Amino acid sequence: MPEGPEIRRAADRLSHVLCGQSLTDVYFFSEELKAFEKILKGSRVEAIVTRGKALLTSLDSGYTIYSHNQLYGRWNIVKAGHFPKTKRSLRMALDTHSHRALLFSASDINVLQSEVIEDHPFLAKIGPDILDEGLTWKVVSRRLLSDKFRNRQLA
């Protein structure tokens, strides 16, 4: 199972090829997400961040893609127009003019309006990501002093 550092490295690789780029095509395996393919196509990727083992892809269209690799999920990055030889099941594809970011075998993918992403059940339970370069002691302090987390242990 991929752990936090592996997800952080995947986010860094994805950021390198996706951030600042417009999506020329979007694919979701899940029927529930198919309607978002047209909505997200043409959106520019603003940021890719991790929250624990979740990866959040923020778009300028006001949506954020939440993905969690679970046990077997794996990201592959290939040049545009290419597809890796694999027996894994493609769950999501984010295409730009130069690259494709392909998520295989993951079972937890959602698209939410960015303003409510923190309401996602997984994200609502966890604190800030310690691997986030933008994390400050003020954010940690605010979280620890919040009603929801007051009097809870850190470890």
Indicate where each model-derived feature is located.
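Phosphate/anion-contacting hairpin/loop surfaces
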Residues: 65-155
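Extended, highly charged segments
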Residues: 1-63, 84
